[in-house]
């Protein structure tokens, strides 16, 4: 049973003799939300950029931040991550990038990113915590752009949309 819980949480059972069990994080998934961990997300991003350059497809990243003036507990983060998983397509890479920051990598243009983001936000306004809000931004990959400049441009988009 412990082994199954560890696998679901993104951990690997290292040793399990008697009542003493130790777990190690697998580095691929966030232990709380079961979404992709940042290193795994950035590796997927690099692969998708290479694929986009070869196949001339559109690639867009959406960055979502959960905001609240009150403390956010683990249950809220888990339900937020579950809603991300259920609101976006199966083939979209979804990750927890920071404490309250999430990233979604989609194959599609900005119109699709806007449509999927609005659908997610409307569902969170119904199902989510009343004291929390969601900010988001998206950026479409430009051919020949490096992964770091792509992510930096996404950060700039979020700053332009925010109130700071």
What label would you give each PLM region?
Residues 1-31:
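Short, low-complexity N-terminal regulatory "tails/caps" that precede and couple sensory modules
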Residues 14-22, 59-62, 90-93:
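Short low-complexity stretches enriched in small and charged residues
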Residues 28-30, 34-49, 53-61, 67-86, ...:
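Conserved long alpha-helical elements within nucleotide-processing catalytic cores of c-di-GMP signaling
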Residues 60, 96, 100-107, 129-157:
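A short glycine-enriched loop-to-beta-strand structural element that forms part of the catalytic core
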Residues 51, 86-91, 120-131:
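Short catalytic/binding micro-motifs of nucleotide second-messenger systems
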């Amino acid at each position: 049973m412990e082994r199954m819980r560890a696998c679901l949480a993104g951990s690997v059972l290292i040793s399990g003799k008697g009542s003493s069990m130790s777990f190690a994080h697998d580095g691929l998934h966030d232990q709380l939300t079961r979404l992709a961990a940042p290193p795994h997300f950035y590796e997927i991003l690099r692969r998708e950029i290479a694929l986009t350059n070869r196949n001339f497809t559109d690639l867009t990243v959406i960055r979502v931040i959960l905001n609240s003036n009150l403390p956010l507990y683990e249950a809220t983060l888990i339900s937020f991550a579950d809603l991300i998983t259920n609101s976006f397509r199966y083939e979209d890479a979804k990750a927890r990038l920071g404490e309250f920051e999430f990233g979604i990598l989609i194959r599609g243009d900005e119109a699709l990113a806007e449509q999927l983001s609005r659908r997610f936000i409307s569902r969170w306004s119904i199902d989510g915590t009343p004291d929390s809000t969601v900010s988001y931004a998206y950026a479409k990959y430009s051919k020949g752009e490096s992964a770091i400049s792509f992510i930096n441009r996404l950060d700039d988009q979020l700053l332009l949309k925010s109130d700071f």
